[in-house]
Structures are given as structure tokens and as C-alpha cells.
């Protein structure tokens, strides 16, 4: 808007205007009043619902529920992922799973020494780019209810994947509804026969995940994959036996 000469003169010729500061309010105070009024309206809407909801107990996140989390890192591996494709993380057959370029097993022994009951089991995947200054996102697809005899393909095309969660870490809950895990000394089974540990101990009670990972990059990328299992153990079973005898 340009300069208008008529704006220099008052419309009220020959009169004076007196402004009373008691009737002025800052814009911030007005906005705060509006916000407080909205909060009071929202609280009035939720009051009858909150009274009913207070009678129920829910967990905010199953991973943070009751129990103790025990992590066992299976392996770290570097994979080369091509554009518009996704690679299978592990096929759960044999000790090496899927060995491609480099594999290092972290946990040689199971970290739980006594009879334990597993309340929940998570498959945790951590992804990291191997080259600096790479601007792409990690994508992922997975299936839980696959038939035990199904042979998964090592590479698939990306079709409607979703992005991996914050910090490039994704957790998948493997619990089956209505399946209770028996008390088992997991360390002895894990150390005696690692190859059969999954088929004999875990998969009858938990889902066997088939997980594929990829990137949004248009080039071949090298990514670091770290695979872990997170066991949620009941707290009543101690890590160290408190007594000695035939029952322990």
C-alpha cells in the first residue's frame, strides 16, 4: 500500500480523543484467556469419561510393562542393499543364519542362569548406514504367521513398506495369544544346542518373524544390521539361586 496524503489528517476535525489505558488489553493476554477457556471446555467434556476410565488399568507400552528385560544380541552384519529391493534379515536356519559379508556373534552364552518363565519376546533390529553423509531412510516389512516349512526369499521388491522407527531401531512383539511359556532353564538349552534352541524352545510358543529391510536410496547402500532378542522375564525368578538343593 502506497502513501496516502489524506491519512495525515484526522476524520474528526476540531475534536480530541482521550484513550483510557484501563480498557486496553495486550494481545497475549487475550490469547491466554482463549486458551484457558478452551481448556475448561475440554475438561468438562472429559470429566464423565475419566470417572469411568479410572476403574481400569492399562499399560502405556507393553515393552515397559512389568517384568525384567534381558537382551541377547545374536549377530551384527554388513549387508549391501540394492535400490527398490529389500533383503531378508535372517532365515532362522543354522547357526550362521544368513552370512553375507561379515558376521560376528555377540552373546556366546545365554545371560539367564536359572529356570525362568518368559512373559514376552521382542525381535529388535538396529540399522546404521556404513558411509557418512548419506541421506536416506530405512524401510521394513515383516511377517509373523508364516508356515514352518515356508522357505523365504532372500531378496524381494519394495511394495508398500513402512519407515523404521526413531533412532533406526524397530521392535516386533512375537507373543502368541493364549500361549503360556513353561519354566525352562534357557541357558543349558542355549549352550547345548544353539541350532535347535529356536525350533524346540522358542517357536512353539512365539512367532517366527520374517523381516525384510531396505532403503529409500537410489544407489547401492551398505548398512549395518544388529539383531537382538529381548526377553521379558518374570521378576519373581531371581538371576542367582538363593538356595542349593535338588529343586534348584
UniProtKB/Swiss-Prot annotation:
Gene Ontology cellular component terms for the protein in this record: viral occlusion body
Keywords recorded for this protein, A-Z: Viral occlusion body
InterPro entries: Polyhedrin (IPR001746)
Keyword presence, Iron: no
GO MF terms held by the record: structural molecule activity
Pfam families, per the entry: Polyhedrin (PF00738)
Signal peptide region: none
Top-level taxon of origin: Viruses
Family: Belongs to the polyhedrin family.
Function of the molecule: Component of the virus occlusion bodies, which are large proteinaceous structures, that protect the virus from the outside environment for extended periods until they are ingested by insect larvae.
Protein name listed in UniProt: Granulin
Species assigned in the record: Cydia pomonella granulosis virus (isolate Mexico/1963)
